[in-house]
Amino acid sequence: MEVNKLIEELVEVIKDRKNDIIFSYLFEEESDKILKKIGEKSSEVIIACKNASKEEQVHEISDLIYNLMVLMMKQNIEIENVIEELGKRRNMTLNKKSTKSVYPSIH
């Protein structure tokens, strides 16, 4: 499936679930629940990447991306905003004469 189409469908799923009682606790105005969920999922990604199979890593990374998208929706951040920022960083990297990148280095 095309990535853009998949992201669009995922955004629609999140919008549809926003009013679901079980899911809506993540959207509570004064709640840190989504932030805690992202912390939990981030830890699970780290552990999976250290100890688990590729299948488990993909599963945990997918959970993290989903929860980040929920947070983005709660904060009124569109996926296009993130894509635009990534494009700016890419262009900045390409335009720099030095090899220093605006992306965090991977060690």
Curated annotation (Swiss-Prot):
One of its GO terms (biological process) is L-histidine biosynthetic process. It is found in: Cytoplasm. It comes from the Bacteria. It comes from Clostridium tetani (strain Massachusetts / E88). Disulfide bonds: none annotated. Pathway: Amino-acid biosynthesis; L-histidine biosynthesis; L-histidine from 5-phospho-alpha-D-ribose 1-diphosphate: step 2/9. PANTHER family: HISTIDINE BIOSYNTHESIS BIFUNCTIONAL PROTEIN, HISTIDINE BIOSYNTHESIS BIFUNCTIONAL PROTEIN HISIE. Its EC number is 3.6.1.31. GO terms for cellular component: cytoplasm. This is Phosphoribosyl-ATP pyrophosphatase. Keywords: Amino-acid biosynthesis, ATP-binding, Cytoplasm, Histidine biosynthesis, Hydrolase, Nucleotide-binding. Belongs to the PRA-PH family. Pfam families: PRA-PH (PF01503). One of its GO terms (molecular function) is ATP binding. The keyword Amino-acid biosynthesis applies.
